[in-house]
From Swiss-Prot:
Domain 4Fe-4S Mo/W bis-MGD-type: 1-56
GO cellular component: cytosol; formate dehydrogenase complex; membrane
GO molecular function, one term: molybdopterin cofactor binding
UniProt-listed CDD domains: MopB_CT_Formate-Dh_H (cd02790), MopB_Formate-Dh-H (cd02753)
Cofactor: [4Fe-4S] cluster; Mo-bis(molybdopterin guanine dinucleotide)
EC code: 1.17.98.4
Protein name: Formate dehydrogenase H
Entry's induction text: By formate. Repressed by oxygen, nitrate, nitrite, and other electron acceptors.
Superkingdom, natural source: Bacteria
Positions bound to [4Fe-4S] cluster: C8, C11, C15, C42
Gene Ontology terms describing biological process: anaerobic electron transport chain; anaerobic respiration; formate oxidation; glucose catabolic process; respiratory electron transport chain; urate catabolic process
Length: 715
């Protein structure tokens, strides 16, 4: 029996785990002494590992390459040589016929690791010749990256998660740490124990609201109106840090002019928050010696997501809560390596290390390093644009790695149509997902636990994860698969191990250069920027100590007028749907749904959280099946009745197959980042009279879908 150190493959807290291996099989997980988790884990950390053993609770592991010879036909098992040759030939032909931008690729924010994401974006740019590479940050924290880049020059958390423990105030805005990042929630609790004030801003009574000094239960979709009113109070009452504003920022007067029009009284109807509460929150935040803002997708998944990020950041600038310990702006990234996927350049506008593709010097640098004459100068397509790009014939092929857009993207009917329109769909994954079932080519890869590499935690912390067991089937690592396709397409790409890849990318990224494999070791946690390979440089806990990463070193004030969400409530669709997370399952559920303990927590068709008064008015009982309708479709789900949701809104998680709430969500893309407005969809909830028939319908539909995916996986 042995123990292998790794990093949890679920959320981005970056928890260290010891996998206990007996006779070549993982038998349990134990908490390790990681910097963030400090010997603790959540239930996913303890019980979220047995998917690797192909439990087939939900869907089987992919075990051999497969090709679908014609649309409508079955997937057929083939050798690796045949599959890789086929992919190389088809991609080359599409590139030749339609141009490189006819091919869309994705990185993966899950267990593939930073090295694989680096190789994938290099493949897209140097081999295909396109910047069409993206990752799931597009549908979650893309607005955080864009907004923070504009405001402070850096799109990541400005503080270490551990710093939360010793701040004087935690401002939790549009973020549910107990469900999304339980170990981060522990640090919020630590802060409370240490005397910190807690402000929670969320329409629901989330778990953190139970320990909050103040819970601002604002109306769905009113974020900017509230933030502008808080800024108004801080300036009006002379609570802002004049020295910080004068020496380290610019744009204050323009900001002041906008928030002047947002008195607390003027936004009471918009926000549903009293003027006195707004003033109390503004004073509490401004008067704290140090204050850390934590936000999640309750900020970013709105049409005005980027603007909300910048408005939050302006509050921090206004009060001098940047560039010092325990104070800052912190988008707590969702999936375990979504920060890493962005760090590695799995974005359509940046090379690794956030070096922008439109800068000629950056293009020249990476072209030289990768041995190509030139690289494309224009920003690539976003993955959320795929339905539109495919419909207009701009994208003809998609190479999807470790993502399940047919489950996780908005307006799923449009996404399905896009995949039908494509000439070639390549899926590289570990499970037969909905997206994999639509593929023309399946490339089965090793899983977390079967390979090694580096993840980046939400707070910029590089950590190594290690191989625990040998893969049982005919699998290759993700970076090996991509490298072999590149070589077959005439671009020799040969790596012997992940360290060779890591060292290549380090030398191209000054902020990452000092984070060597040796320095990370088993339990090391190196937060970029880390620019020196010496042991003296252990990374950077908090950012902006001396200057901001903007061109002139100054933070940029910004806000704008509040605009109502795009989807409108009507008599036909009188309630708001907001998609959320839950603690027991993760993302598209392909991993957690195949873990025995986690799968036992809940099953299809999932839940719609609904307020007790709304349920009573509609004649809906707790646990009853209901129909939820939107302008884009309808789904069946189970009512979860309580006083936690606000009246007039329902909340659903997106991982369920039958109760797939993304069937309902209208995309309503942000004009800046093309992030869908998952947090505001007009819906109607209807009770179902014949509950017995509805229960049987769920069972039948679930079994049909599981059977279809299992048959596809077994070819």
């Amino acid at each position: 029996m042995k123990k292998v150190v790794t990093v949890c493959p679920y959320c981005a807290s970056g928890c260290k785990i010891n996998l206990v291996v007996d006779n070549g099989k993982i038998v349990r997980a134990e908490a390790a002494q990681g910097k963030t988790n400090q010997g603790t884990l959540c239930l996913k950390g303890y019980y979220g590992w047995d998917f690797i053993n192909d439990t087939q609770i939900l869907t089987p592991r992919l075990k051999t390459p497969m090709i679908r010879r014609q649309r409508g036909g079955k997937l057929e098992p083939v050798s690796w040589d045949e599959a890789l040759n086929y992919v190389a030939e088809r991609l080359s032909a599409i590139k030749e016929k339609y141009g490189p931008d006819a091919i869309q690729t994705t990185g993966s924010s899950r267990g593939t690791g930073n090295e694989t994401n680096y190789v994938m974006q290099k493949f897209a740019r140097a081999v295909i010749g396109t910047n069409n590479v993206d990752c799931c940050a597009r549908v979650u924290h893309g607005p955080s990256v864009a907004g923070l880049h504009q405001s402070v020059g850096n799109g990541a958390m400005s503080n270490a998660i551990n710093e939360i423990d010793n701040t004087d105030l935690v401002f939790v805005f549009g973020y549910n740490p107990a469900d999304s990042h339980p170990i981060v929630a522990n640090h919020v609790i630590n802060a409370k124990r240490n005397g910190a004030k807690i402000i929670v801003c969320d329409p629901r009574k989330i778990e953190t609201a139970r320990i909050a000094d103040m819970h601002i239960a604002l109306k769905n979709g009113s974020n900017i109106a509230l933030l502008n009113a808080m800024g108004h109070v801080i300036i009006e009452e002379n609570l802002y840090d004049k020295a910080f504003v004068a020496s380290r920022t610019e744009g204050f007067e323009e900001y002041r002019k906008i928030v002047e029009g947002y008195t607390p009284e003027s936004v009471e109807d918009i926000t549903g928050v009293s003027a006195s509460e707004i003033r109390q929150a503004a004073r509490m935040y401004a008067q704290a010696k140090s204050a850390a803002i934590l936000w999640g997708m309750g900020v970013t998944q709105f049409y005005q997501g980027v603007e909300t990020v910048r408005s939050l950041t302006s509050l921090a600038m206004l009060t001098g809560n940047l560039g010092k310990p325990h104070a800052g702006v912190n988008p707590v990234r969702g999936q375990n390596n979504v920060q890493g996927a962005c760090d590695m350049g799995a974005l359509p506008d940046t090379y690794p290390g956030y070096q922008y593709v439109k800068d000629p010097a950056n293009r020249e640098k990476f072209a030289k390093a990768w041995g190509v004459e030139s690289l494309p100068a224009h920003t690539g397509y976003r993955i959320s644009e795929l339905p539109h790009r495919a419909a207009h014939g701009e994208v003809r092929a998609a190479y999807i790695m470790g993502e399940d857009p047919l489950q996780t993207d908005a307006e799923l009917s449009a996404v399905r149509k896009a995949f039908e329109d494509l000439e070639l769909v390549i899926v590289q994954d570990i499970f037969m997902t909905k997206t994999a079932s639509a593929a023309d080519v399946i490339l089965p890869s090793t899983s977390w636990g079967e390979h090694e590499g580096v993840f980046t935690a939400a707070d910029r912390g590089f950590q190594r994860f290690f191989k625990a067991v040998e893969p049982k089937w005919d699998l290759k690592t993700d970076w090996q698969i991509i490298s072999e396709i590149a070589t077959r397409m005439g671009y020799p790409m040969h790596y012997n191990n992940t360290q060779e890849i890591w060292d290549e990318l380090r030398h191209l990224c000054p902020d990452f250069y000092g984070a060597t494999y040796e320095k990370m070791g088993e339990l090391g946690f190196i937060q970029w920027p880390c620019r020196d390979t010496s042991d003296a440089d252990q990374g950077t806990s908090y950012l902006f100590k001396e200057k901001f990463d903007t061109p002139n070193g100054l933070a940029q004030f910004f806000t704008c007028d509040w605009v109502a969400p795009i989807d409108k409530l009507t008599d036909e669709y009188p309630m708001v749907l907001s998609t959320v997370r839950e603690v027991g399952h993760y993302s598209c559920r392909s991993m957690t749904g195949n873990c025995a303990a986690l799968a036992a927590l809940a099953d299809e068709p999932g839940y719609a959280q609904i307020n007790t008064e709304d349920a009573k008015r509609l004649g809906i009982e707790d646990e009853a099946l209901v129909w939820v309708h939107s302008r884009k479709g309808k789904i069946i789900t189970r009512a979860q009745v309580s006083d936690r949701p606000n009246k007039g809104a329902i909340y659903m998680t997106y991982q369920w197959w039958i109760g797939a709430c993304n069937e309902l969500v209208t995309e309503n893309l942000s004009p800046i980042t093309k992030t869908p407005e998952y947090k505001y969809c007009a819906v109607r909830v209807e009770p179902i009279a014949d509950q017995r028939a509805a229960e049987q319908y769920v069972i039948d539909e679930y079994n049909k879908l599981k059977t279809r995916l299992r048959e596809a996986a077994l070819a």
